[in-house]
Amino acid sequence: MDTDILKMQDREVFEAIALETGRQMETLELIASENFTSRAVMQACGSVMTNKYAEGYPGKRYYGGCEFVDIAENLARDRAKKLFGCEYVNVQPHSGSSANMAVLFSVLKPGDCIMGLDLSHGGHLTHGSSVNFSGQMYKAHAYGVDGETGIIDMNQVEKMALEVRPRLIICGASAYSQGFDFKAFREIADKVGAFLMADIAHPAGLIVSGLLSDPMPHCHFVTTTTHKTLRGPRGGMIMMGKDFENPMGITIKTKNGQRVKMMSEVMDAEVMPGIQGGPLMHIIAGKAVAFGEALRPEFRQYAMQVRSNAAAMSERFLSLGYNIVSGGTKNHLMLLDLRNKDITGKVVENTLHEAGITVNKNMVPFDDKSPFVTSGIRIGTAAMTTRGMNEDDSRLIAELIDRVILSAASPESSSVCRSVKEEIRSLCLRNPLEGYGVTPS
């Protein structure tokens, strides 16, 4: 990566970037929400598109001079529609959280009832957590997983929906290693007259590759991030399989009177000017590049390897005596319940960091520890697979993590971490990140 100008102009920022580059190149990234973009995506994100304000949408901007950024946004929209098989898409949300906010604002009033997966059972802050706007503006009710299987209890979901009569049901997760039965969720939503929103931020890359069930035929709204398993720049997106007249009765004036707005019009207005102003056109250009990459046949091979690596790693953890919530994985991640190892997620996260392995502590279902301590760790295989690692590497990584955990409370912990860190560094250098080289001075 060419950073000569930055190095001359701002040495402090250059050094920070160089050090972070070294960390990414020589340590193992296993945080499930992280991945490595292509150089083409990074070049688009670092392009002159960052200089252009473009409030509004292609062909209907509030600023002049938008004819070329319109090309980039139309490419992103058209490619996303082809990739996900949807009729409507908005690529302007700055994040998955802002995409979720736009959907909630478009169909809910303050005080309306919503349902989402419990944060401690693998859900997300924007699905009704009390510390988030979604749990503060709305009456949020959380469904959870079965205590024995670790899988979402659809009977509980239906019972709760019939009791609280939500306006919106959210199906999605940030730490759930199984798929979602979108058809069953839609049947429940229809019984109570609720909207259904799927948040596929984590498994989107696997879904577009046909490896997990497709939410488009069943959900009114689908949101996602554009990084994680999609391997694009950090950002969000809103989709609808089919557009429809908004059931809230919102109208728009026409030459002949007025008409009911389509839901796509309501959603676009909620994104801009509802919660955002100018879109990040350099990021939208990067999204277009990433969607183009995901449309290629080799992306499906990548997604298949991500899932295969996760399966191999989870099976090795199980054979080493670890408990995995839900008993295994069908996607790119796994949630290790460490309670039978008598160690906390916080300790494991910190100790693995010393060994050159990055994970995040994570609450497990029915956890009795705080979110700052936790009884589990979340592990994902999207980033390591981008480096070219395979099933054998995945099993080796599980064994190295086990070595670190078993020694964490012993006097040998530091020496074990040093030894594992060297093995991890060698593994990473055998599977390099092409074109990421920035050397600190």
Curated annotation (Swiss-Prot):
Pfam families: SHMT. The keyword Transit peptide does not apply. Transmembrane segments: none annotated. GO terms for cellular component: cytosol. InterPro entries: PyrdxlP-dep_Trfase, PyrdxlP-dep_Trfase_major, PyrdxlP-dep_Trfase_small, Ser_HO-MeTrfase, Ser_HO-MeTrfase-like, Ser_HO-MeTrfase_PLP_BS, SHMT-like_dom. The record marks H227 as: Plays an important role in substrate specificity. It is found in: Cytoplasm. This is Serine hydroxymethyltransferase. HAMAP family: SHMT. It catalyses: (6R)-5,10-methylene-5,6,7,8-tetrahydrofolate + glycine + H2O = (6S)-5,6,7,8-tetrahydrofolate + L-serine. One of its GO terms (molecular function) is glycine hydroxymethyltransferase activity. Catalyzes the reversible interconversion of serine and glycine with tetrahydrofolate (THF) serving as the one-carbon carrier. This reaction serves as the major source of one-carbon groups required for the biosynthesis of purines, thymidylate, methionine, and other important biomolecules. Also exhibits THF-independent aldolase activity toward beta-hydroxyamino acids, producing glycine and aldehydes, via a retro-aldol mechanism. Its main location: cytoplasm. Gene3D superfamilies: Aspartate Aminotransferase, domain 1 (3.90.1150.10), Type I PLP-dependent aspartate aminotransferase-like (Major domain) (3.40.640.10). Its EC number is 2.1.2.1. GO terms for biological process: glycine biosynthetic process from serine; tetrahydrofolate interconversion. Keywords: Amino-acid biosynthesis, Cytoplasm, One-carbon metabolism, Pyridoxal phosphate, Transferase. Belongs to the SHMT family. It comes from Chlorobium phaeovibrioides (strain DSM 265 / 1930). The lineage of its organism: Bacteria, Pseudomonadati, Chlorobiota, Chlorobiia, Chlorobiales. Pathway: One-carbon metabolism; tetrahydrofolate interconversion; Amino-acid biosynthesis; glycine biosynthesis; glycine from L-serine: step 1/1. (6S)-5,6,7,8-tetrahydrofolate binds at L119, G123, H124, L125, S370, P371, F372. Homodimer. The gene is glyA. Its cofactor is pyridoxal 5'-phosphate. The modification N6-(pyridoxal phosphate)lysine is found at K228. It comes from the Bacteria.
